[in-house]
């Protein structure tokens, strides 16, 4: 159904034609584990056309075999993203939903998902920089651990192109395992977040160095934004910023030639650029002063 998505966490109260901001308990333990694999080239490729649920199952079974226990033995539900089958070189996007035997803290789950990018060979070998150059583009996105996260599951509307899947239902598969749930608690007990963070920072430095960029030494200031404490990056790289569109509330940007439309600011306040990628928000003026000045002039009646 058009527009359908999964809200990762339980809502505090019903939502009706309003923002979901602040409506979920960000610290509530979760029993839903989602692996969001983005721009991933699997070992077992999907066919270029005529993709069925059986094809999807075979691909996911091969991916699951690379995962650590207890995921390797657990059943999961697979959902192919809207771009799957449309990109070159067999690159796909997948959501894998696992049910946990016991609820776990979101913060621990976030670190563990980040660590999967280093301990799964197929993930680690495909890591690269985000377009901003200031963060790693994870194969397995840790942002989906958040209780407030939306996970888009609707089949795409195909206009002028042929759907590579036989039917919308073929974008889904129940991939049976030895157990219906998985118990992450023993694994999370031994998790050291500082170790994961160090590996993440080293990976970022190595990827930046490979592109001739210096090591990023981030500087932050803590700001109160809409009642929330936010760490804002005050020394971003110089960025190419392209305004894509504006709505009544927000302006959306692409960075360094990207096409995700994942960066945004309130129309009337261009000071801080936020994003949907899990990167730290940054000061627009520091990233591109010319664009900042242009925006302030262009939208001065709304600022």
Where are these regions (language model features)?
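Structured loops at beta-to-helix junctions and adjacent beta-edge loops in soluble globular domains
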Residues: 36-38, 81, 99, 153-158, ...
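Generic recognition of flexible, low-complexity loop/linker segments
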Residues: 20-23, 83-85, 139-141, 259-264
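Short conserved micro-motifs at the rims of enzyme active sites and ligand-binding pockets
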Residues: 45-47, 162-168, 286-287
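Signature for HUH/AEP ssDNA processing cores
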Residues: 1-94, 98-116, 206-218
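Catalytic "initiation/cleavage/transfer" segments centered on a nucleophilic residue
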Residues: 116-217
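Flexible, charged surface loops at secondary-structure boundaries
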Residues: 26-29, 145, 267
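Short, small/acidic-rich helices and loops at N termini and domain boundaries
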Residues: 267-303
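Long, charged low-complexity interaction segments
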Residues: 89, 97-99, 185-273, 278-281
């Amino acid at each position: 159904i058009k527009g359908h998505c999964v809200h990762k966490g339980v809502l505090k109260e019903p939502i009706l034609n309003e923002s979901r901001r602040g409506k979920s308990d960000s610290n509530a333990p979760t029993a839903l584990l989602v692996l969001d694999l983005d721009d991933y080239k699997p070992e077992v490729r999907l066919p270029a056309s005529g993709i069925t649920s059986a094809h999807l199952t075979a691909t996911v079974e091969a991916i699951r075999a690379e995962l650590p226990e207890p995921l390797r033995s657990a059943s999961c539900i697979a959902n192919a993203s809207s771009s799957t089958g449309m990109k070159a070189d067999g690159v796909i996007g997948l959501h894998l939903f696992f049910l946990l035997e016991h609820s776990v803290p979101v913060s621990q789950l976030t670190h563990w998902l980040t660590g999967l990018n280093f301990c799964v060979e197929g993930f680690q070998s495909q890591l690269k920089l985000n377009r901003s150059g200031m963060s790693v583009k994870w194969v397995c996105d840790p942002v989906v651990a958040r209780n407030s996260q939306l996970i888009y599951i609707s089949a795409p509307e195909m206009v002028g192109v042929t759907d590579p899947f036989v039917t919308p239902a073929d974008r889904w598969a129940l991939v049976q395992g030895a157990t219906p749930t998985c118990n992450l608690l023993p694994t999370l007990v031994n998790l050291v977040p500082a170790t994961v963070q160090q590996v993440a920072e080293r990976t970022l430095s190595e990827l930046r160095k490979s592109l001739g960029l210096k090591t990023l030494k981030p500087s932050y200031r803590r700001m109160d934004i809409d009642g929330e404490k936010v760490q804002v990056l005050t020394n971003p790289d110089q960025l190419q910023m392209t305004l894509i569109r504006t709505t009544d509330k927000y302006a959306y940007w692409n960075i360094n030639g990207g096409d995700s439309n994942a960066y945004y600011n309130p129309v009337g306040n261009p000071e801080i650029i936020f994003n949907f990628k899990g990167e730290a928000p940054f000061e627009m003026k520091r990233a591109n002063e010319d664009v900042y000045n242009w925006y302030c002039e262009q939208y001065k009646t709304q600022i």
